[in-house]
Amino acid sequence: MPNTFFGMTIGASGLFASNAAINTTAHNISNINTKGYTRQSVSQEAGFAIRVYKPYGAVGTGVAMVDISQVRSQYYDERYRHNNAQCGQYENLQTYSELVQTYLDEFNTEGFIAEYNNLFKTIDALKSDPSSEVKRGQMLSHLSSVCNYFNTLSTNMQNTQNDINEEIKSSVSSINTMAEQIASLNKQINTIEASGGSANDLRDTRNLIVDQLSYYADVTVNEREIGNGVSDYTVTFNGQNIVTGYTYDTLQCVARETDKKRNASDVEGLYDIKWSNGNPYNPYEENGRGSLKALFDMRDGCNDSYEKVKTDANGNQSLEIVVDSYRNPSYKGIPYYQSQLNRFVTTLAKEFNDIITKGQLADGTMNTEK
């Protein structure tokens, strides 16, 4: 049986351990609204037993506090980052799809349907009285209005494509900054933990940055214990290592040359992305996720095809839609709507011109002008 003072020491160890647990609980409650904070827990184990050369061999010395560790699930980290990438993807697709919808404005009195209906109303009115200068003027006025509508719509589409292009550049800059921060935190965490300290707060910061990084693309993390409190922390971004221990890779935006446009209606200077080490970056992967993929889908997506301008022997130009699932993503982005718009306008203009060249003049003679 332990003596009085030894018993008090055992009791005191329990009080100290309980006090540490209470303080840690208070710390957890205080940080309940802290973004990125991970709940902490006091790890305890039985104190080192003392041999007393008795039949029972040894006596316990109370409880010892081993560590204050984070209570975090790797499985839920992976699921969160997977879903965060999907969230980033669909948020961007929704934002820009709704913007295109406002341009088309089909349910407004001044949208496409209204312009189309007004044009053919004036055509029907002119059919009943072809010689009327007033009705001719009204039809020409509505034709001009339709042309202005399509020109404005095309300009809005091009401006949106350019805005998406700039957002891609901004996203790449943010991704590079986060990669640099993670590499720096890896070094700080290893420095502290190699000397026996606890780097829970720095680990929280690192996990928060990785969570934010997962918004842009698929992210996976692998932490491998090396020994003596040092670990090798690797982050992959869209299938390629972006952080390996204390080093990191970056993405670069490279403007396309004019003769390398994906679509005839694309604005100048659209960016492609590559890794700084020279490896290609593919934002069009079918099973990819993330806000960065959504931006490329919306900027370049043309329903597995692309728009090509053909010129015949007489110098006349026409549009051709070429099916090529390897060139552009399947999503119906800005180029798709531009392509449909161009086809509609080209067809409408051709039909009008054909009718005019086959029509009669005011004096009843056939039109001979081409």
What is each PLM-predicted segment?
Residues 83-174, 180, 187-190, 365-366:
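Extracytoplasmic/periplasmic terminal helices and flexible tails
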